[in-house]
């Protein structure tokens, strides 16, 4: 018997919009909203996890700070404080009675005027939250996923502002993801404009060779991921070295292991790139150690990082 998944708009629950809780089905904007036409908006992806102490949001303050930084880069003045947005995210998780789930804050430009310039328009903010499991599949978390290098190139750092988690930037990700999933792969890898590895369609990438972990530096156009930063802390705790450098595709082909990271992807092993098996073709030992340490942290089992968890 197939399970019917409700559409994103037709659900019970509450969404926080511009300071008010509204019924899920009533959370609407006008079709002439500026962001809908020109793509200038910013968002975050945040996760809440079930812990022994209760439901907690992982690295809430850092996600909210990045949202505000993205808005600043896009010259959007969010009409709320970071503390108010933090409170809104906690409230949405409570209102929707989530033990764990995904949280989506989004800021957009309103419908006061239309035209390329948004000057004088209104800025809005919403926060939604819902239950969401493993982004790239539960099996992929253990076995690893199949990845293909996309024919699409990641944005140059001076074409779009790559350190903004901007709505418009994800057209590039959408095209890359559709291209490779249509061919049966799980996710896309994108190169930068010089042909070096940048990141996945929605994830940062790490590569393991001879016990050393490598990841592209941010000049390759990759987003400064919060899960990426978390892995740096985990690696230090485990006595593992991380080197930020330019990485070529063929370095991944001959790597021992590779994995994606992201709020949605969490820590997902990569078993294959471009039909070439990586290492043993399964989750490697370094990846497994990092993955285990990550889930210990987000589920409240590592007291060293209790400050990263905000109870709702």
Regions found by a protein language model. Name each.
Residues 1-80, 87-91, 114-312:
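Helix-start/capping segments and mature chain N-termini
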Residues 85-100, 104-113, 130:
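Short, acidic/charged, Gly/Pro-enriched secondary-structure junctions
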């Amino acid at each position: 018997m197939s399970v019917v998944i409700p559409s994103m708009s037709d659900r019970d629950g509450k969404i926080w919009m511009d300071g008010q809780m509204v019924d899920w089905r009533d959370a609407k904007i006008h079709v002439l909203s500026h962001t809908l036409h020109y793509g200038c908006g910013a968002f975050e992806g945040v996760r809440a996890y079930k812990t022994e102490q209760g439901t907690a949001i992982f690295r809430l303050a850092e996600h909210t700070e990045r949202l505000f930084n993205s808005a600043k880069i896009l010259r959007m003045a969010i009409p709320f404080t970071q503390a108010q947005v933090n409170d809104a995210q906690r409230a949405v998780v409570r209102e929707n009675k989530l033990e764990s789930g995904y949280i989506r804050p989004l800021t957009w430009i309103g419908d006061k005027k239309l035209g390329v310039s948004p000057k004088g328009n209104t800025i809005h903010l919403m926060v939604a939250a819902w239950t969401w499991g493993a982004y790239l599949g539960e099996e992929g978390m253990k076995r690893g996923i199949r990845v293909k290098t996309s024919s699409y190139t990641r944005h140059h750092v001076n074409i779009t502002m790559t350190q903004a988690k901007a709505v418009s930037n994800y057209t590039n990700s959408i095209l890359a993801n559709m291209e490779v999933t249509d061919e049966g792969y799980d996710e896309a890898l994108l190169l930068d404009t010089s042909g070096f590895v940048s990141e996945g369609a929605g994830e940062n990438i790490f590569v393991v060779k001879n016990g050393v972990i490598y990841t592209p530096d941010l000049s390759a156009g990759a987003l400064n991921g919060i899960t990426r930063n978390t892995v740096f802390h985990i690696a230090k705790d485990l006595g593992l070295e991380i080197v930020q450098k330019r990485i070529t595709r063929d370095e991944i082909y001959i790597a021992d292991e590779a994995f994606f990271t992201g709020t949605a992807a969490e820590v997902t092993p990569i078993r294959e790139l471009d039909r070439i098996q990586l290492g043993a073709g399964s989750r490697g030992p370094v990846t497994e150690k990092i993955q285990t340490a990550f889930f210990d942290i987000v589920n409240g089992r590592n007291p060293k990082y209790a400050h990263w968890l905000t109870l709702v």
